[in-house]
Amino acid sequence: MFSLLLVAVLAQGPLTPPGPPTSPAPDAGVADAVVPPLPVASLPPATHDLFRRIQGRVSQVRIIERRSGTKSSIGSAFFVSEKGHALTNYHVVSDVVLHPEDYTAELDRGDATVPVRLLAVDVASDLAIIQVEAPVADFFRLEDREPPQGTRLFAMGNPRDLGTTIVEGTYNGLVRDALYERVHFSGAINPGMSGGPTLSGEGNVVGVNVATMGNQVGFLVPVTKARQLLDRTLALPAPPDAAALRKSVGEQLMANQQRITDRLMATELPKQGLGDYRVPGRWSPFLKCWGDTPHDPETPYTVTSYQCSSEEDIFLSSSHRTGVVTYLHQHVTSQKLGAMRFSALYSTLFSQDPDPVPATREDVTNFRCKSEFVDVKGLTVRAAICLRAYRRFPGLYDLVLRAATLNASTHGVDTSLTLGGFSADNARKLARRYLEGLSWTK
């Protein structure tokens, strides 16, 4: 990178040695023009002054693997109380929550490394609060409300273990129709900056760095979520142990799936036309929907797809995501294949596994499935419903529903629904409502 910068600098230099500067001869009787200095009030606030004032409030979080005694991952955190409370992301400290026997956390204060205690998490917002033992004199104030759109902001953190940095960007409001509240920040948030603060020009916290899509598209946890978690933590009668922390994660996941279920069940399921069928459309504004029909003249059949999914999820661990709703419809038709060959094609399509919610065997059990033929308002449908349980969080499941219409010999709709992190009752309830959205228009 440094060589590229050097090349860029050299490319801007002159091609020939510069001669003495020249200037046009002044007109007789005309005084030299004097350019007035720019008023100080019109200059932007100096980023280096802000950085110098507050850099001691931001620290690097190190997750230490106990057996090796070395760091396995890093993030950022910032102090928010004189009692040593600091905010960071849940995903930064998730290993400590899920595997406290294998991992611990510490803060690099620059002149010393100090152990921290994990006090509270908000898994849906991706927040956590840690605490150092000694009190701190210098800490951030959390803003009471979101800033106006277009406000100039400053993100801080420790990108790629390069030391504390400050990055300028712009506040662009809450992400519209998001399942989990996020702020759109136009600025660079790089790996290692997760859990760091994003600040107003006065140095107050307006959000917590959480994710990036690259190309100056970053995301923050709203400051209101951070304040709510801090208030709950300060009200704790005693620090929780590891079992209580994990239990709180399960309770939060259970509350989150209930919120999503209530929201979907309270909404009329819209219908989307797909060939001669009507299928579930965009069930809620937090779902993004897309459609496509590949065109290959050599293929003797046509597949038109329509897919909806929640673009956000909940990070549980590096191997496990949850809090997901996604579904896919495929309308298959052929004028070239006979009934027998189309049936074989259709069966192959039905037997393909949809992409499940990311998880490993340590996270979830194997799927257990039940297959049957059902009548949906006169439309015969072959359906298979599969559930797998969460090992660490009893009562939570992933569901996969597969269904295919069977009313025609050379066309049909194959559909799949995937739900991540729901109770068994709520998952089945949503699957039934989903199946009721299938119909034939002829």
Predicted regions and their residues:
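C-terminal subregion of chymotrypsin/trypsin-like serine protease catalytic domains
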Residues: 51, 201-267, 428
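Surface-exposed amphipathic alpha-helical segments
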Residues: 227, 237, 282, 286-287, ...
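Non-catalytic interaction/regulatory modules that flank or connect domains
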Residues: 256-368
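Signature of long, low-cysteine stretches enriched in small and polar/charged residues
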Residues: 344-405
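N-terminal activation segment of mature serine protease catalytic domains
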Residues: 20-76, 238-239, 243-295
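Catalytic nucleophile loop of clan PA
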Residues: 78-79, 188-208
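Flexible, gly/ser-rich surface segments that form the specificity/activation loops bordering the active-site cleft
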Residues: 92-97, 138-183, 190-193, 210-219
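Catalytic-histidine neighborhood of serine endopeptidases
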Residues: 74, 81-124
